[in-house]
Amino acid sequence: MGKPTRVTNEIRRLRFVNGEMTQAELARRLNVTRQTVIAIEQGRYSPSLEIAFQIARVFDAPLDAVFQYPHSDN
């Protein structure tokens, strides 16, 4: 895979506060592979906008509560 993304996320925490959902269960609900969930969770892959919204919906959370992008000082 390429270089890590600057986007961070709260997916792992959200999985645990939502009944200790497994990566496999989240992958099933998103119709992606478990490996994709792992890569997104670890910041090695940025999801498509569609998948990002689906993740937020699974956790009934706003998109910016799931994903964060650092502000640029430029």
Where are these regions (language model features)?
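Short, charged recognition helix plus adjacent turn
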Residues: M1, R57, F67-N74
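DNA major-groove recognition helix of helix-turn-helix/homeodomain DNA-binding modules
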Residues: E50-A65
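Key DNA-contacting residues within the recognition helix of helix-turn-helix
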Residues: R12, I38-A39, F67
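Residue-level detection of the helix-turn-helix DNA-binding "recognition helix"
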Residues: T5, F16, N31, Q42
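Recognition helix of helix-turn-helix/homeodomain-like DNA-binding domains
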Residues: V32-S46
